[in-house]
Curated annotation (Swiss-Prot):
The gene is nanE. GO terms for cellular component: cytosol. Its EC number is 5.1.3.9. One of its GO terms (biological process) is N-acetylneuraminate catabolic process. Keywords: Carbohydrate metabolism, Isomerase. It comes from the Bacteria. Converts N-acetylmannosamine-6-phosphate (ManNAc-6-P) to N-acetylglucosamine-6-phosphate (GlcNAc-6-P). It catalyses: an N-acyl-D-glucosamine 6-phosphate = an N-acyl-D-mannosamine 6-phosphate. InterPro entries: Aldolase_TIM, NanE, RibuloseP-bd_barrel. It is an enzyme of class 5 (isomerase). Belongs to the NanE family. GO terms for molecular function: N-acylglucosamine-6-phosphate 2-epimerase activity. This is Putative N-acetylmannosamine-6-phosphate 2-epimerase.
Length: 234
């Protein structure tokens, strides 16, 4: 298992490259109760030249670590109804991820009500206090959320949840305006969410982002096939 990179070292590694999100949830075609599928996705991504992997769950992350030394952005998706945040939504999930020695832990940092009752700045501060050497990424949906997370000391701001909160911009593709605004504010941005084509990724890279995550367009065959099928209907 490689040593955890510093922020500067990781930014060097991610610059100008693609982080591939390798995830499948229960009910999706590539989900398996016994595992074994996401590490194959990660292996394919590495062979293509990916600079990092984003993965969900302790099991998948451990399996991916066994086959690649690429830096991992780790999350744990767990619902806490009636609250909406479900991406590494409490300290319990942070603890589980911190034990894996991964490069980055990503967390929901939207302004929505949380299961733990904390505001996002307080949550970030608690995590940083408990794990001072752990790099952290805020999954946000608006500029203001990104700014709050940045000011609270987060290392990276990801545009992951733009379009997935009712109050954020609803776009069919990536929220380029949000990515650009965060970059102009001097924030280390990891662009993520609805990046469907190499052309979109190139355009986003030219904005000066710290990294780019592509998921569905690479690792969700049902979604990819659906796009081709819908195009023929129009």
């Amino acid at each position: 298992m490689p040593d955890k990179p510093t922020k500067e070292k990781l930014m060097e590694q991610l610059k100008g490259g693609i982080i591939v999100s390798c995830q499948a949830l229960p009910g999706e075609p590539l989900y398996s109760e016994t595992g074994g599928i996401m590490p194959l996705m990660a292996k394919a991504a590495q062979e293509a030249g990916a600079v990092g992997i984003r993965a969900n769950s302790v099991r998948d992350i451990k399996e991916i670590q066994a086959i690649t030394d690429l830096p991992i952005i780790g999350i744990i998706k767990k619902d806490y109804p009636p609250q909406e945040p479900f991406i590494t939504a409490t300290m319990t999930e942070v603890d589980q991820l911190a034990a894996l020695n991964i490069a980055v832990i990503a967390m929901d940092c939207t302004k929505r009500d949380r299961h733990d009752g904390l505001d996002i700045a307080s949550f970030i501060r608690q995590v940083k206090e408990k794990y001072p050497n752990q790099l952290l990424m805020a999954d946000i949906s608006t500029f203001d959320e990104g700014l709050v997370a940045h000011q609270a000391g987060i290392d990276f701001v990801g545009t992951t949840l733009s379009g997935y909160t009712p109050y954020s911009r609803q776009e069919a593709g990536p929220d380029v305006a949000l990515i650009e605004a965060l970059c102009k504010a001097g924030i280390a941005v990891i662009a993520e969410g609805k990046i469907h084509s190499p052309e979109e990724a190139k355009k986003i890279n030219d904005l000066g982002v710290a990294g780019i995550v592509v998921g569905g367009a690479i690792t969700r065959p049902k979604e990819i096939a659906g796009r081709f099928i819908e195009a023929l209907k129009s």
